[in-house]
Amino acid sequence: MNTIGKSFRITAWGESHGKALGAVVDGCPSNLPLTGEDIQKELNRRRPGYSLFSTPRKEGDKVEILSGIFEGKTTGTPISAIVYNTNQKSKDYSHLKNTPRPGHADLSYKLKYGNYDYRGGGRSSGRTTIGHTIGGAIAKKLLDYTHNIKIIGYTTKIGNIEGDFNYYNSIENNEKMINEELINKIENNPLRCPSSNADEMKDFVLNAMENKNSVGGVIELIALNVPVGVGNPIFGKLNGELSNAIMNINAVKGVEIGRGFESAELLGSEMNDEYYYDENNNIKLKTNNCGGVLGGISCGAPLVIRVAVKPTPSISAVQSTINIENKTTENLEIGGRHDPIIVPRVIPVLESMVAIALSDLMIRGGFIHPCKL
């Protein structure tokens, strides 16, 4: 499927070396103030060729809105947006037609579909997340406009190097941790990492590049101001919908909510979040080990999500593969232009998937009117 969502639906389309990529967003209520710039600023955060640690393939990724906006506001009809490819070098991939790249989707696509566009990974390329980002930009605007929901992501780990900044290290100030100073620090760092040891992580990536290799990492996502009651108790749980949306990104290999796998090591007395009333008689959690979700439903605390991102599979080192046509084993040396690490560029995509899942659940749950704002 190329569509995600039930009430707020995103259909992403296009291939890495095709003419264009884009998305159709259906189910966005009318009267939401929205311009091309709202989408462009998110696309700019994920576009390639503008960082030491991204692919040299330089693309402007200029978005054009084709429908669904009138006089600066949504109309409630499908919003269609397109981004044209301008810097393809398809000849770099001609030798890969019958030799699937280890770690890529080449083999599974070839065996499932037979005829597929292998250039630059085709439909499985990270470039196809342009559609996700278009949908996410609209979802972010909807959540912010209706409920002041803020979503932010940042790198907490590169390879085996753990950063010293994460939500649980900052729990005393968790309600105020997302601010302009932090956002600027993240966005001005090539790894989108606010930790004090980010330079050590940079050196780790540079060393991998020198050795014709790639690295992965861990990203933390925080969503503030999510109201109580989003999600369902059995199927359609908030944590289930978030995990599903995030795991639909090719590079993602794992998702944790709150303390995640660490919770298996804790005692019940350590894991349980005790309650109290604040000065305004609002129910609060003393801790937030649950990551903002109890029984599949938001509890008013910040959503805390961690995502494991694998190393970029395209590496310059020689690897062993097969030739599907000749039925032989051979060595493969991948050319083309590739990211040594995808972690910083995938952050806006992951933020988008969180926003899309939340928007869909909140429309379905009555928090956002499905027709007009």
Curated annotation (Swiss-Prot):
Gene Ontology CC: cytosol
A Pfam family it matches: Chorismate_synt
Keyword terms: Amino-acid biosynthesis, Aromatic amino acid biosynthesis, FAD, Flavoprotein, FMN, Lyase, NADP
Swiss-Prot/TrEMBL catalytic activity: 5-O-(1-carboxyvinyl)-3-phosphoshikimate = chorismate + phosphate
Positions of NADP(+) binding: R46
Free-text comment on the cofactor: Reduced FMN (FMNH(2)).
Enzyme Commission code(s) on record: 4.2.3.5
TM segment ranges: none
UniProt superkingdom: Archaea
GO BP terms in the entry: amino acid biosynthetic process; aromatic amino acid family biosynthetic process; chorismate biosynthetic process
Cofactor names: FMNH2
GO molecular function: chorismate synthase activity; FMN binding
Enzyme class (EC, first level): lyase
Keyword NADP set for record: yes
Pathway: Metabolic intermediate biosynthesis; chorismate biosynthesis; chorismate from D-erythrose 4-phosphate and phosphoenolpyruvate: step 7/7
Binding site for FMN: R123, S124, S125, N250, A251, G295, K310, P311, T312, P313, S314, R337
Known function: This reaction introduces a second double bond into the aromatic ring system.
Family to which this protein belongs: Belongs to the chorismate synthase family.
PANTHER family the record matches: CHORISMATE SYNTHASE
Name of protein: Chorismate synthase
Gene symbol of the encoding locus: aroC
